[in-house]
Regions:
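Intrinsically disordered, low-structural-confidence terminal and linker regions
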Residues: 1-51
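Cofactor-binding active-site loop characterized by glycine-rich and histidine/acidic residues
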Residues: 63, 67-93, 99-251, 465-467, ...
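Non-catalytic terminal/interface segments that mediate subunit docking, oligomerization
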Residues: 65-69, 79-87, 133, 391-545, ...
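Active-site nucleophile and cofactor-binding loops and adjacent substrate-binding regions
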Residues: 98-114, 133-140, 186-205, 231-235, ...
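A glycine-rich helix N-cap at a beta->alpha junction
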Residues: 154-169, 248-259, 288, 477, ...
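Thiamine diphosphate
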Residues: 172-190, 201-205, 219-227, 235, ...
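Glycine-rich phosphate/pyrophosphate-binding loops
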Residues: 213-227, 506-523, 677-680, 778-779
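N-terminal leader/propeptide and maturation segments of large enzyme subunits in energy/redox metabolism
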Residues: 370-428, 771-777, 786-794
Length: 801
């Protein structure tokens, strides 16, 4: 900690005058305080008293002493969670039968997180302010659970299970990797291997390393503070995390305090930051990116308290200097680096084994391992009376302050947005124009909801010029009228970084638009958010953030300007595999059908939408009434020719509807009865997989009205791969022998729309060939001989344009 600090002589004199400081200096077991940390605690204590946050120095030092005891106890609980079925609060050694037959845990990382999270809790107590927290390494959740139990920071279900002293702790140990299941197959215990909705104050699972680094700066709103615990292993994961100083603005961002746990090891080997040269190089890299790195002792919870406090003060001073004209954006963002060793506080620290199971054997059946466990756990033991005193001190100083469980980021529920008027059109235009105007007016009508647009550098090309003109690229030095220091468009050629800006902005209005093929790079970040929100719903505390669309445009069927890398339907297919009550996968066919979807998307809570929208001009198909019915029902009857043995034609996608209508015209000329339905929301017509998804699917009456059982022969032309669509939509494609599904067949290249359709056997001619097969008539009953030859790959494709 590069600060002006007192000398060693001053500290010794202070210890003689302040018995509470002298008592804290003793540390506890492996928790010992370096000269630098001692000086930092002295300085912090005086600042807290001078700021009126604490009555006197003795009160501060007493809490630091309690912090050591809570930290040691939590370290002891964490190693018990990995290895033991019971804990002895009296400090007696465990016997063979007290240990698990199959120990499991991410022990080393969790041990490293104990002083970090304990320091965060202590800072909240000392300052009377509840900050939020985020942990990128979600597998270290044992540290969080242990300290939450010790401090009484629990959701009701965890309080019932784990709060009653030694018995509760024993249940905690037994539930941790206990694999117990409820009758419905869900985990039976209110506990997990990663951060989950049972984790008090948790806001992200932290299962995908690297995404916390991309998201933390976009999470807090002005007036809020977030402490983000990050992994040194994840520093290898995401370049976008280096750009945080580019995006942070005091005017619309809360305080974000990143702290890297630099333990020097990943699972199988040391990290680059595990070397002195690597760590120094990383600090230099941070400075070049606009950060203000602060190294400190990551083994000591007191060092976390002092560093977090110092980071807050530094950022506040930087903002004041910016307001005074001394600095300009980007401001130096304080970045804590907690230097430690993997698994500090227990046997095996610093080894590869520390990651999972640090002991050389299982204490359940290995005498040496049992002795090592008892020896090292005993060094962490705190007398019950001293532990109870520490817990009581933390509780008493909380006062009326909200529990960390109830921090503002964990309770996100922004106001209902004002929806602008819907401006339907009757001319051919880009469906993206509906989104462009609606979102611009939505943001203008809701100034209290922070707007964020995620843009991988194609906003204008993707027909969102109005959004760009109104909201502007966020930059430090504007070079055009489309850029601004306060811009709300986060632009980077990094899909994960820009989608993370919106996933993190749970207090506002969001929009992400990208080429469909490149949206695939967003899947991990999106899926982590969807999973966490679904689990929140399942435990009875549903997410309150406002829904928003992930727009996949310049899509597969209209991106023939580029090669096949730009032609990929994976994104919508993958999201269709997620739960339909959490993400809607939508294929509007025209401007009006796109526009009619937007109010329900932005009014929803804890739900995303994948909008696959053409950017090129498309003819108007649906008027306002039809578009709103389509938005409500998920599918709509487009046209019908009555008669015997009718075919059921189903189009899914704008270009697919165009081809289906051409095929239907030829059927009409042949006197064949048919019914043409446009399928905008496939997930509405799947078989529900659980009781929550039941609420998202169409009822039987609607299904029968749109897809009547009397129409047995069915042809689906889909935007997606045919196999994916058939799998999800088996309820409306019940008989494989009497149905045909056409779609993307992984064919492409530099082709126009008609060329893409022909290459994938998904044009109107292929539809008619499928109809002929189901009708058991030759293709030439519906196609000319020349057209039939083209469909068979033996003629001129131009005939089918």
């Amino acid at each position: 900690m590069s600060q002006i600090l007192p000398s060693q002589d001053e500290l010794l004199a202070h210890a003689a005058a302040e018995p509470a400081f002298a008592a804290w200096l003793q540390g506890h077991g492996p928790l010992q305080h370096s000269a630098e940390t001692r000086a930092a605690v002295f300085r912090t204590a005086h600042q807290l008293v001078q700021a009126g946050l604490q009555p006197d120095l003795a009160s501060v030092y007493q809490l630091f002493r309690a912090l050591d005891r809570l930290t040691a106890s939590a370290l002891r609980i964490v190693v018990h969670m990995t290895y033991a079925r019971r804990i002895r609060l009296d400090g007696q050694p465990l016997q063979a039968e007290d240990f698990k037959t199959q120990p499991e845990g991410h022990t080393g990382g969790a041990l490293n997180m104990v002083p970090a999270y304990a320091g965060y809790l202590a800072l909240n107590v000392l300052t009377g302010k509840t900050r939020a927290w985020l942990m990128g390494q979600g597998h270290c959740v044992a540290a969080i659970d242990a300290l939450n139990v010790l401090t009484g920071n629990l959701h009701p279900e965890q309080e019932r299970a784990y709060a009653d002293g030694e018995e509760g702790l024993n249940r905690l140990l037994q539930d941790f990797y206990g694999y117990a299941q409820a009758p419905n197959g869900a985990p039976a215990a209110p506990l997990g291997s990663h951060v989950n909705p049972h984790t008090a104050g948790g806001i992200a699972e932290g299962g995908y390393l690297g995404f916390a680094e991309l998201q933390y700066a976009h999470m807090p709103l002005p007036g809020e503070t977030l402490v983000a615990f990050l992994s040194d292993g994840a520093a290898e994961e995401q370049r976008g995390s280096d750009w945080i100083p580019r995006w942070w603005r005091a005017e619309d961002c809360g305080v974000a305090l990143p702290v890297m746990i630099a333990n020097g090891r990943r699972i199988e080997q040391r990290t680059e930051l595990g070397t002195h040269e690597g760590l120094e190089g990383f600090k230099l890299h941070l400075r070049r990116c606009g950060f203000d790195p602060i190294s400190f002792d990551g083994r000591d919870p007191a060092a976390f308290v002092c560093t977090l406090w110092e980071m807050e003060q530094r950022l506040e001073r930087r903002v004041q200097e910016k307001n005074s004209g001394i600095l300009r954006y980007p401001l130096p963002i304080p970045y804590g680096i907690a230097e430690t060793v993997k698994g500090f506080g227990f046997y095996g620290a610093g080894s590869n084994a520390a990651h999972n199971l640090p002991l050389p054997g299982n204490p359940h059946n290995d005498e040496q391992a049992r002795q090592l466990f008892n020896q090292h756990a005993n060094e962490l033991w705190v007398e019950p009376e001293a532990l109870e005193l520490a817990r009581r001190l933390f509780a008493e100083q909380r006062g009326e302050r909200p529990l960390e469980r109830d921090n503002p980021l964990a309770l996100r529920h922004p106001i209902e947005p004002i929806i602008p008027p819907l401006r339907y059109r009757d001319d051919a235009c880009s469906p993206m124009a509906a989104l462009d105007r609606f979102y611009t007016e939505l943001v203008e009508a809701n100034p209290d909801l922070r707007a964020r647009v995620g843009n991988p550098d194609e906003l204008a090309s993707n027909r969102l010029g109005g959004v760009l003109k109104a909201l502007k690229h966020r930059v430090s030095e504007p070079e055009s009228e489309l850029e601004s220091v306060s811009g709300r468009v986060i632009t980077a050629l990094n899909e994960e970084a820009v989608v993370s800006a919106c996933l993190a902005n749970q207090g506002g209005l969001n929009l992400v638009a990208s080429y469909e093929a490149f949206c695939v790079k967003m899947l991990g970040a999106v899926r982590q958010t969807l999973i966490f929100a679904r689990q929140q719903k399942e435990v009875g505390r549903p997410a309150g953030w406002l829904g928003w669309p992930l727009v996949a445009t310049s899509h597969t069927w209209e991106n023939g300007k580029n090669q096949q890398s730009h032609q990929d339907t994976t994104f919508c297919e993958a999201l269709l595999g997620e739960m339909s009550d959490m993400v809607r996968v939508l294929f509007p066919a025209d401007h009006n059908s796109a526009l009619a979807l937007l109010p329900t998307i932005y009014r929803s809570r804890g739900q995303l939408a994948c909008l696959v929208i053409p950017k090129r001009d498309r003819p108007m198909v649906f008027d306002a009434v039809q578009a709103e019915r389509l938005a409500r029902d998920g599918a709509i009857l487009v046209e019908e020719r009555c008669g015997s043995d009718p075919l059921l034609l189903i189009a899914n996608g704008s270009y697919q509807l165009e081809q289906m209508r051409r095929a239907a015209q030829r059927l009409a000329e042949a006197g064949q009865a048919y019914r043409l339905v446009y399928l905008q929301e496939p997930g509405r017509f799947r078989a529900p997989r659980d009781r929550w998804e039941v609420e998202a699917v169409a009822d039987e009456a609607l299904v029968e009205r749109l897809f009547p059982d009397s129409h047995e022969r069915r042809v689906l032309l889909t935007h997606m791969r045919a196999e994916v669509a058939r799998g999800h939509l088996w309820p409306i494609l019940p008989d494989a022998r009497r149905t045909s599904v056409l779609g993307y067949r992984n064919r492409g290249g530099t082709l126009d729309e008609a060329g893409m359709q022909f290459a994938n056997r998904a044009c109107w001619g292929n539809v008619l060939a499928a109809c002929a097969r189901l009708m058991e008539v030759p293709r030439t009953a519906l196609l000319t001989p020349e057209e039939a030859a083209a469909v068979a790959g033996k003629g001129d494709p131009a005939l089918l344009r």
